[in-house]
Amino acid sequence: MIVQRVVLNSRPGKNGNPVAENFRMEEVYLPDNINEGQVQVRTLYLSVDPYMRCRMNEDTGTDYITPWQLSQVVDGGGIGIIEESKHTNLTKGDFVTSFYWPWQTKVILDGNSLEKVDPQLVDGHLSYFLGAIGMPGLTSLIGIQEKGHITAGSNKTMVVSGAAGACGSVAGQIGHFLGCSRVVGICGTHEKCILLTSELGFDAAINYKKDNVAEQLRESCPAGVDVYFDNVGGNISDTVISQMNENSHIILCGQISQYNKDVPYPPPLSPAIEAIQKERNITRERFLVLNYKDKFEPGILQLSQWFKEGKLKIKETVINGLENMGAAFQSMMTGGNIGKQIVCISEEISL
């Protein structure tokens, strides 16, 4: 059988901006037979995420993710349906997910590398397992639980940068659920600001491209900032940190403004901002959700419950077609998405 796949065509360079042309689509032969323990799956949805920018470099700069290889199939979060199985615990028609799903229309995988998912947890919206009820949602929930030091009724103010993205749009809502009295989002368009306050429960939103961020932050956070969920790094984070209170906490989720630059992760703070951090005893620790695998199952159930109760509002931006993976990635890296950026490969979930 002939199937389509996406491979890494070129690297943008450590300081380069990724473009759609860094990827290319090609056809490949898929064997007709599968071996014991394997399954043949049809890809339904694929995820593009900021961390993938590191995988485009020859050296990712981390020990927990490997680089993509030139002319080899690209992989990441994915959801699919099993079409044929020779694995004892997986049967035809099961929906499965993996963090290392090849960007390919159909693929033969080791069944042990897949996790079965229950469509009832997402009311049939399978793509949510790649977003708010998947790794981004878990990153937001566990990050806030482990590093935010929020308790019910603690009257804390939380600021979220990259607030209209996959993690940020969920993190702000969770901040309220867990006890923050005020949540302020920072994002890059007027449309996103309106969405945050009108649909996602943020108390205020700042457009960093138009507003004076320092001024708007003082207005929106009159009592200062107690918790900062940092998705972007760079100048925005410097501005937020300068308005943080004593003994406050930074949840270091991502640094998308720095991902196209050859700097260590997390990037060091400037001397002036580092001095503020030390003076005010602000904690700033790298947070890696993969270190909390024991919390994944209860976390998914909690996120699903909030969603089913109508409390957790889920936003996603969907592009159709494997041929658009590169365009979707480029768009996500430049803020073209609201909520989770998803690529729909096949919507046909019947066999």
Swiss-Prot record:
Query: GO cellular component annotations, sorted alphabetically?
Result: cytoplasm
Where is the protein situated, by its record's location annotation? Cytoplasm
What EC class is this?
oxidoreductase
Instruction: Provide the binding site for substrate.
Output: 99-100, 288-290
Name the Enzyme Commission number(s) assigned to this protein.
1.3.1.48
An example GO biological process term is: prostaglandin metabolic process
Main location (coarse class): cytoplasm
Q: Which GO terms describe its molecular function?
A: 15-oxoprostaglandin 13-oxidase [NAD(P)+] activity
| Stored CDD domains | PTGR2 (cd08293)
Q: Which UniProt keywords apply?
A: Cytoplasm, Lipid metabolism, NADP, Oxidoreductase
* A matching Pfam family: ADH_zinc_N
Q: In which tissues is it expressed?
A: Widely expressed.
Going by the entry's taxonomy, the superkingdom of the source organism is recorded as Eukaryota
Reactions catalysed, semicolon-separated, are:
13,14-dihydro-15-oxo-prostaglandin E2 + NAD(+) = 15-oxoprostaglandin E2 + NADH + H(+); 13,14-dihydro-15-oxo-prostaglandin E2 + NADP(+) = 15-oxoprostaglandin E2 + NADPH + H(+); 13,14-dihydro-15-oxo-PGF2alpha + NADP(+) = 15-oxoprostaglandin F2alpha + NADPH + H(+); 13,14-dihydro-15-oxo-prostaglandin E1 + NADP(+) = 15-oxoprostaglandin E1 + NADPH + H(+)
Bilayer-spanning residue ranges: none
Binding site residues for NADP(+): 165-168, 192, 208, 231, 253-259, 287-289, 337
Quaternary structure?
A: Monomer.
Described by its record, this protein's role is as follows: Functions as 15-oxo-prostaglandin 13-reductase and acts on 15-keto-PGE1, 15-keto-PGE2, 15-keto-PGE1-alpha and 15-keto-PGE2-alpha with highest activity towards 15-keto-PGE2. Overexpression represses transcriptional activity of PPARG and inhibits adipocyte differentiation.
The Swiss-Prot or TrEMBL record describes its family as follows: Belongs to the NADP-dependent oxidoreductase L4BD family.
The protein's name is: Prostaglandin reductase 2
**Upper taxonomic classification of the species?**
Eukaryota, Metazoa, Chordata, Craniata, Vertebrata
Gene from which this protein is expressed: PTGR2
